[in-house]
Amino acid sequence: MNINVASLLNGNYILLLFVVLALGLCLGKVRLGSVQLGNSIGVLVVSLLLGQQHFAINTEALNLGFMLFIFCVGVEAGPNFFSIFFRDGKNYLMLALVMVGSAMVIAIGLGKLFHWDIGLTAGMLAGSMTSTPVLVGAGDTLRNTITNGPALLAAQDHLSLGYALTYLIGLVSLIFGARYLPKLQHQDLSTSAQQIARERGLDTDSQRKVYLPVIRAYRVGPELVAWADGKNLRELGIYRQTGCYIERIRRNGILANPDGDAVLQVGDEISLVGYPDAHARLDPSFRNGKEVFDRDLLDMRIVTEEIVVKNSNAVNKRLSQLKLTDHGCFLNRVIRSQIEMPIDDSIVLNKGDVLQVSGDARRVKSVAEKIGFISIHSQVTDLLAFCAFFIIGLLIGQITIQFSNFSFGIGNAAGLLMAGIMLGFLRANHPTFGYIPQGALNMVKEFGLMVFMAGVGLSAGAGIGNSLGAVGGQMLIAGLIVSLVPVVICFLFGAYVLRMNRALLFGAIMGARTCAPAMEIISDTARSNIPALGYAGTYAIANVLLTLAGSLIVVLWPGILG
């Protein structure tokens, strides 16, 4: 049996798409030194090579891919997006604006210098910034602004080419910049991290030890009753003195949860919960009694829940003001915009932050009701909300704004981004609305991006040979400039205008570039995870600004040429 692979792939778009994805994902695992190519560049390279052999897929698959990706970007940014504008995130907002704005201006200048079209210029900007949102925003706006078929195809091909030629340049140069730029400035990054740690009272060690509570049980003897001197539990203030609290009491065979009016009696059996050092602070009259090993008395249902910050008595409050340990609860993690933050008592909580809390199930539930709500542990996506807001995004994208003789269509990219932000924001405020498991969101976003990459690569591959020889050298120079110069500008602005702490500043710069590998290098250099505070501050807003930059550069281009 003879199988013509070329005919089989050309006759089956779905098969071709998944062959490209599979081969590209395999290529993406290849490492050049310490740098991994990554899924995006792997799929793009494979699709460009197959595109040269005149393989192609339906353009609707490309459109659906970019729509899913950009909508999911908005959903992820939504919970913390508005806090950037309305609170002390103004420094992070300004840094993100400087980074994206300077990169766009430099890209436009280089595009004019080298006499490129808008496709090459926007693609070079997207690749140099290692930013798929720029590519998506530019591609969508090109489809809305260029009505001539051949001109649109040429611009789209050049967009893919510019991205493919400069992506690896942008990634490698930023990683080297993250490694060596901190060493060129006069302040040591580790010292800056320690300074913030001293000011805010947090541990600079990224591997923070979390001690879980210990439960022990004792039989009340005459010595302990004498120590209590007839006072009830409220008057004794055991928790205030030691950090332990009485969780249960067994009296005459009956197990109960005591209230503050309970008075200890000889023969009672009590269970106390607290950190190990808290048990050590107990009065000797507790420990001198006979320790009890009773399954029911020692049985405490410890749970770990993710609590979403929502209520006004927690939003804009410092972490220390929650006094979680006073409620018998213990904090394990603080997550903002899918980024784990250092546990810092001075962190001001934003709406949508997630606190991972451990403790007795009843106590954790009580704390959650005061702070916000427990994130539901479901693997079921609210598809109705997902589809409804997706439709809203497409409808917003149809809006056209008219200024005199100039008209500007919002476009699907910006419309879906706005709808995604709205869905993410509402999800952070309503526990049962619009739930999308993080794993499902990641999968849809990644799949949409890979489909989009496969589409643009296959469409651009046919003409890549001729274009590569004409602009390859120029792209190398332009990619380095657009990748590194905005980083230097952002550093100077943050260091000497905003006067930011260097550890926070470098974290914020990497967040503005949305580059996780570079962020890891900054944390290693600082020997601390404190830069994550800055990274989280700029990451969400930068994703949105980069998408808008991709659309804006296409809109501005005709006027610049004129």
Curated annotation (Swiss-Prot):
The keyword Cell membrane applies. The chain crosses the membrane at residues 8-28, 37-57, 66-86, 94-114, 158-178, 383-403, 406-426, 447-467, 475-495, 541-561. It is a multi-pass membrane protein. GO terms for cellular component: plasma membrane. Keywords: Cell membrane, Membrane, Repeat, Transmembrane, Transmembrane helix, Transport. Belongs to the AAE transporter (TC 2.A.81) family. YbjL subfamily. This is Putative transport protein Spro_1639. The lineage of its organism: Bacteria, Pseudomonadati, Pseudomonadota, Gammaproteobacteria, Enterobacterales.
